[in-house]
Amino acid sequence: MNWEDGRLFLAVARAGQMLGAAKALGINQATLSRRMSALEASLGASLLIRRTNGCELTEEGEALAASLERAEAELLQAQARFGGAGSEISGTVRIGAPDGFGVSFLAPRLAHLSDRHPGLTIQLVPVPQAFSLSKREADIAVMVGRPEQGRLVASKLTDYTLSLYASRDYADRHGLPETTDGLRSHRLVGYVEDLIYAPTLNYTASFWSGWRSRIEISSATGQLEAVRAGAGIGVLHDYLAAGRNDLVSVLPDVVVQRAYWIVYHESLRGLARIKAATGFLNEAVRAEAGRFVRAPRG
Protein backbone atom coordinates (compact mmCIF):
# COMPACT_ATOMS: atom_id res chain seq x y z
CA MET A 1 0.00 0.00 0.00
CA ASN A 2 1.35 3.42 -0.92
CA TRP A 3 0.73 6.69 0.91
CA GLU A 4 -1.66 7.97 -1.76
CA ASP A 5 -3.97 5.02 -1.09
CA GLY A 6 -3.64 5.70 2.62
CA ARG A 7 -4.48 9.37 2.13
CA LEU A 8 -7.63 8.48 0.19
CA PHE A 9 -8.68 5.93 2.79
CA LEU A 10 -8.23 8.43 5.61
CA ALA A 11 -10.43 10.90 3.76
CA VAL A 12 -13.20 8.29 3.53
CA ALA A 13 -12.78 7.31 7.18
CA ARG A 14 -13.04 10.93 8.30
CA ALA A 15 -15.95 11.85 6.05
CA GLY A 16 -17.91 8.69 6.79
CA GLN A 17 -19.08 8.56 3.17
CA MET A 18 -17.67 8.27 -0.34
CA LEU A 19 -19.40 11.35 -1.73
CA GLY A 20 -18.17 13.72 0.97
CA ALA A 21 -14.64 12.33 0.78
CA ALA A 22 -14.60 12.58 -3.03
CA LYS A 23 -15.69 16.22 -2.89
CA ALA A 24 -13.02 17.02 -0.31
CA LEU A 25 -10.36 15.29 -2.42
CA GLY A 26 -11.54 16.80 -5.70
CA ILE A 27 -11.97 13.46 -7.45
CA ASN A 28 -14.88 11.46 -8.88
CA GLN A 29 -16.90 9.38 -6.42
CA ALA A 30 -16.80 6.30 -8.65
CA THR A 31 -13.02 6.61 -8.95
CA LEU A 32 -12.65 6.82 -5.18
CA SER A 33 -14.91 3.81 -4.68
CA ARG A 34 -12.81 1.76 -7.13
CA ARG A 35 -9.61 2.82 -5.35
CA MET A 36 -11.05 1.68 -2.01
CA SER A 37 -12.11 -1.67 -3.48
CA ALA A 38 -8.64 -2.11 -4.97
CA LEU A 39 -7.05 -1.25 -1.61
CA GLU A 40 -9.18 -3.86 0.16
CA ALA A 41 -8.25 -6.44 -2.48
CA SER A 42 -4.53 -5.67 -2.17
CA LEU A 43 -4.64 -6.00 1.62
CA GLY A 44 -6.94 -9.00 1.59
CA ALA A 45 -9.19 -7.35 4.16
CA SER A 46 -12.59 -5.71 4.34
CA LEU A 47 -12.08 -2.12 5.51
CA LEU A 48 -15.45 -0.49 4.91
CA ILE A 49 -19.09 -1.41 5.39
CA ARG A 50 -20.88 0.44 2.63
CA ARG A 51 -24.40 1.61 3.47
CA THR A 52 -26.90 3.76 1.60
CA ASN A 53 -26.24 6.68 3.97
CA GLY A 54 -22.47 6.35 4.22
CA CYS A 55 -19.59 4.10 5.21
CA GLU A 56 -18.66 2.50 8.50
CA LEU A 57 -15.20 1.19 9.33
CA THR A 58 -14.74 -2.49 10.06
CA GLU A 59 -12.42 -3.60 12.84
CA GLU A 60 -9.64 -3.90 10.25
CA GLY A 61 -10.55 -0.46 8.91
CA GLU A 62 -10.32 1.04 12.39
CA ALA A 63 -6.88 -0.49 12.86
CA LEU A 64 -5.66 0.80 9.49
CA ALA A 65 -7.05 4.29 10.12
CA ALA A 66 -5.30 4.43 13.50
CA SER A 67 -1.98 3.37 11.94
CA LEU A 68 -2.28 5.88 9.10
CA GLU A 69 -3.17 8.71 11.47
CA ARG A 70 -0.10 7.94 13.57
CA ALA A 71 2.02 8.02 10.42
CA GLU A 72 0.37 11.28 9.38
CA ALA A 73 1.11 12.77 12.80
CA GLU A 74 4.78 11.78 12.54
CA LEU A 75 4.99 13.34 9.08
CA LEU A 76 3.43 16.59 10.23
CA GLN A 77 5.73 16.74 13.24
CA ALA A 78 8.74 16.23 10.97
CA GLN A 79 7.52 19.00 8.68
CA ALA A 80 7.08 21.31 11.64
CA ARG A 81 10.54 20.50 12.97
CA PHE A 82 12.32 21.24 9.73
CA GLY A 83 10.25 24.32 8.95
CA GLY A 84 9.16 25.55 5.57
CA ALA A 85 5.65 25.66 4.20
CA GLY A 86 4.88 22.30 5.75
CA SER A 87 5.04 23.79 9.26
CA GLU A 88 1.71 25.57 8.76
CA ILE A 89 -1.22 23.79 10.36
CA SER A 90 -3.62 22.70 7.64
CA GLY A 91 -6.36 20.23 6.90
CA THR A 92 -9.88 20.01 8.29
CA VAL A 93 -11.02 19.73 11.89
CA ARG A 94 -14.67 18.97 12.67
CA ILE A 95 -15.95 19.96 16.10
CA GLY A 96 -19.21 18.55 17.39
CA ALA A 97 -20.86 20.39 20.26
CA PRO A 98 -24.22 20.80 22.00
CA ASP A 99 -26.17 23.54 20.26
CA GLY A 100 -26.15 25.94 23.21
CA PHE A 101 -22.37 25.91 23.52
CA GLY A 102 -21.73 25.52 19.80
CA VAL A 103 -24.05 28.25 18.51
CA SER A 104 -23.96 30.85 21.28
CA PHE A 105 -20.40 30.54 22.57
CA LEU A 106 -18.13 28.81 20.07
CA ALA A 107 -19.41 29.98 16.67
CA PRO A 108 -18.77 33.71 17.34
CA ARG A 109 -15.16 32.92 18.27
CA LEU A 110 -14.12 30.64 15.41
CA ALA A 111 -12.76 33.55 13.36
CA HIS A 112 -9.97 33.90 15.94
CA LEU A 113 -8.94 30.27 15.39
CA SER A 114 -9.09 30.77 11.62
CA ASP A 115 -6.97 33.93 11.84
CA ARG A 116 -4.39 32.02 13.85
CA HIS A 117 -4.28 29.09 11.40
CA PRO A 118 -5.32 30.28 7.91
CA GLY A 119 -4.63 26.87 6.38
CA LEU A 120 -7.08 25.13 8.69
CA THR A 121 -10.67 24.42 7.61
CA ILE A 122 -12.96 24.45 10.66
CA GLN A 123 -16.26 22.59 10.62
CA LEU A 124 -18.65 23.18 13.52
CA VAL A 125 -21.57 20.79 14.00
CA PRO A 126 -23.68 22.33 16.81
CA VAL A 127 -26.51 19.84 17.13
CA PRO A 128 -28.13 18.12 20.15
CA GLN A 129 -26.88 14.58 19.54
CA ALA A 130 -24.24 12.10 20.62
CA PHE A 131 -21.29 12.01 18.23
CA SER A 132 -19.59 8.74 17.29
CA LEU A 133 -15.90 9.56 17.27
CA SER A 134 -14.98 6.05 16.14
CA LYS A 135 -17.12 6.58 13.03
CA ARG A 136 -15.52 10.00 12.44
CA GLU A 137 -18.79 11.94 12.85
CA ALA A 138 -16.53 14.52 14.51
CA ASP A 139 -12.81 14.83 15.17
CA ILE A 140 -13.43 16.57 18.48
CA ALA A 141 -16.61 16.50 20.54
CA VAL A 142 -17.62 18.77 23.38
CA MET A 143 -19.62 16.40 25.58
CA VAL A 144 -21.70 16.74 28.72
CA GLY A 145 -19.96 14.41 31.17
CA ARG A 146 -16.91 12.23 30.73
CA PRO A 147 -17.33 9.20 28.45
CA GLU A 148 -16.77 5.88 30.18
CA GLN A 149 -16.10 3.67 27.17
CA GLY A 150 -14.07 3.67 23.98
CA ARG A 151 -10.51 4.48 22.95
CA LEU A 152 -10.95 8.16 23.73
CA VAL A 153 -8.88 11.01 25.11
CA ALA A 154 -10.95 13.21 27.44
CA SER A 155 -10.14 16.39 29.34
CA LYS A 156 -12.47 18.60 31.35
CA LEU A 157 -13.28 21.88 29.64
CA THR A 158 -15.41 23.61 32.28
CA ASP A 159 -18.19 23.23 34.78
CA TYR A 160 -21.41 25.05 33.95
CA THR A 161 -24.66 25.70 35.78
CA LEU A 162 -28.33 25.78 34.88
CA SER A 163 -31.18 27.62 36.60
CA LEU A 164 -34.88 28.28 36.21
CA TYR A 165 -35.95 31.33 34.21
CA ALA A 166 -39.07 33.03 32.89
CA SER A 167 -39.65 36.14 30.84
CA ARG A 168 -40.56 39.38 32.63
CA ASP A 169 -43.82 39.38 30.74
CA TYR A 170 -44.66 35.85 31.90
CA ALA A 171 -43.80 36.76 35.51
CA ASP A 172 -46.03 39.86 35.36
CA ARG A 173 -48.97 37.87 33.96
CA HIS A 174 -48.69 34.67 35.99
CA GLY A 175 -46.47 35.40 38.98
CA LEU A 176 -43.63 33.11 40.03
CA PRO A 177 -43.56 30.05 42.30
CA GLU A 178 -42.02 30.30 45.76
CA THR A 179 -41.12 26.60 45.95
CA THR A 180 -40.34 23.88 43.43
CA ASP A 181 -43.70 22.28 44.20
CA GLY A 182 -45.29 25.52 43.01
CA LEU A 183 -44.04 24.73 39.50
CA ARG A 184 -47.04 22.42 39.05
CA SER A 185 -49.31 25.44 38.49
CA HIS A 186 -47.12 26.89 35.72
CA ARG A 187 -46.54 26.09 32.07
CA LEU A 188 -43.13 24.44 31.81
CA VAL A 189 -40.69 24.33 28.90
CA GLY A 190 -38.27 21.41 28.51
CA TYR A 191 -36.67 18.86 26.20
CA VAL A 192 -38.45 16.28 24.07
CA GLU A 193 -37.87 13.42 26.49
CA ASP A 194 -37.43 10.58 24.01
CA LEU A 195 -34.79 12.61 22.15
CA ILE A 196 -32.58 13.20 25.20
CA TYR A 197 -29.41 11.39 24.14
CA ALA A 198 -27.62 11.29 27.52
CA PRO A 199 -28.99 10.87 31.09
CA THR A 200 -26.96 13.89 32.27
CA LEU A 201 -29.07 16.07 29.96
CA ASN A 202 -32.26 15.32 31.88
CA TYR A 203 -31.95 18.64 33.69
CA THR A 204 -35.60 19.13 34.60
CA ALA A 205 -35.80 16.12 36.93
CA SER A 206 -32.91 17.61 38.91
CA PHE A 207 -35.06 20.65 39.69
CA TRP A 208 -38.38 18.93 40.39
CA SER A 209 -39.19 15.23 40.16
CA GLY A 210 -42.75 16.05 39.08
CA TRP A 211 -41.69 18.13 36.07
CA ARG A 212 -44.03 17.76 33.10
CA SER A 213 -43.26 19.98 30.12
CA ARG A 214 -46.18 21.39 28.18
CA ILE A 215 -43.82 22.75 25.53
CA GLU A 216 -40.95 20.45 24.50
CA ILE A 217 -38.04 21.60 22.32
CA SER A 218 -35.00 19.44 21.52
CA SER A 219 -32.64 22.42 21.43
CA ALA A 220 -31.17 24.52 24.24
CA THR A 221 -31.19 27.65 22.09
CA GLY A 222 -34.77 26.90 21.06
CA GLN A 223 -35.82 26.63 24.70
CA LEU A 224 -34.07 29.92 25.44
CA GLU A 225 -36.00 31.73 22.73
CA ALA A 226 -39.31 30.16 23.79
CA VAL A 227 -38.82 31.22 27.41
CA ARG A 228 -37.83 34.73 26.33
CA ALA A 229 -41.05 34.91 24.32
CA GLY A 230 -43.15 34.12 27.40
CA ALA A 231 -43.84 30.44 26.73
CA GLY A 232 -43.35 29.48 30.37
CA ILE A 233 -40.71 28.59 32.94
CA GLY A 234 -37.70 26.66 31.69
CA VAL A 235 -34.28 25.36 32.69
CA LEU A 236 -31.65 27.46 30.92
CA HIS A 237 -27.88 27.47 30.86
CA ASP A 238 -26.79 30.43 32.99
CA TYR A 239 -24.16 31.47 30.46
CA LEU A 240 -26.88 31.69 27.78
CA ALA A 241 -29.29 33.62 30.01
CA ALA A 242 -26.70 36.04 31.41
CA GLY A 243 -27.19 39.67 30.45
CA ARG A 244 -30.66 39.16 28.97
CA ASN A 245 -32.80 41.81 30.64
CA ASP A 246 -36.02 40.25 29.39
CA LEU A 247 -35.45 37.21 31.65
CA VAL A 248 -35.96 36.87 35.41
CA SER A 249 -34.56 34.19 37.68
CA VAL A 250 -37.05 31.73 39.19
CA LEU A 251 -36.16 30.13 42.55
CA PRO A 252 -32.61 31.53 42.34
CA ASP A 253 -31.37 29.38 45.22
CA VAL A 254 -31.82 26.25 43.09
CA VAL A 255 -28.88 25.54 40.76
CA VAL A 256 -27.81 22.40 38.88
CA GLN A 257 -24.20 21.87 37.79
CA ARG A 258 -22.81 19.84 34.92
CA ALA A 259 -19.48 19.78 33.06
CA TYR A 260 -18.33 19.98 29.45
CA TRP A 261 -15.52 17.68 28.35
CA ILE A 262 -13.30 17.80 25.27
CA VAL A 263 -13.13 14.32 23.74
CA TYR A 264 -11.39 12.87 20.69
CA HIS A 265 -10.35 9.44 19.46
CA GLU A 266 -6.95 8.33 20.71
CA SER A 267 -5.79 7.72 17.13
CA LEU A 268 -5.86 11.51 16.63
CA ARG A 269 -3.54 12.19 19.55
CA GLY A 270 -0.56 14.26 18.46
CA LEU A 271 -2.09 15.67 15.26
CA ALA A 272 -1.29 19.35 14.94
CA ARG A 273 -4.80 20.36 13.94
CA ILE A 274 -6.28 18.55 16.96
CA LYS A 275 -3.81 20.24 19.29
CA ALA A 276 -4.60 23.61 17.74
CA ALA A 277 -8.36 23.20 18.06
CA THR A 278 -8.39 21.77 21.59
CA GLY A 279 -5.91 24.39 22.73
CA PHE A 280 -8.14 27.11 21.32
CA LEU A 281 -11.23 25.67 23.02
CA ASN A 282 -9.50 25.67 26.40
CA GLU A 283 -8.14 29.16 25.86
CA ALA A 284 -11.53 30.60 24.82
CA VAL A 285 -13.30 29.11 27.84
CA ARG A 286 -10.59 30.16 30.31
CA ALA A 287 -10.84 33.74 29.05
CA GLU A 288 -14.49 33.83 30.12
CA ALA A 289 -14.53 31.25 32.89
CA GLY A 290 -16.66 33.38 35.19
CA ARG A 291 -19.69 33.28 32.92
CA PHE A 292 -20.21 29.51 33.01
CA VAL A 293 -20.88 28.94 36.72
CA ARG A 294 -23.38 30.79 38.90
CA ALA A 295 -23.39 30.29 42.65
CA PRO A 296 -26.74 29.73 44.42
CA ARG A 297 -28.25 32.92 45.82
CA GLY A 298 -30.16 31.33 48.64
Give the role of each language-model region:
Residues 23, 41, 115:
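Alpha-helical residues within the helix-turn-helix
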Residues 40-57:
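A short LG(V/I)-centered, amphipathic sequence patch enriched
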Residues 90-150:
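Central regulatory/effector-binding core of bacterial HTH transcription factors
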Residues 11-26:
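Short helix-boundary/capping micro-motifs
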Residues 52-55, 59-62, 73-96, 295:
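Short helix-loop hinge/linker segments at domain boundaries
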Residues 39-40, 247:
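Conserved amphipathic alpha-helical core elements
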Residues 135, 147-260, 287-298:
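C-terminal regulatory
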Residues 28, 35-38, 109:
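Residues within the DNA-recognition helix of helix-turn-helix
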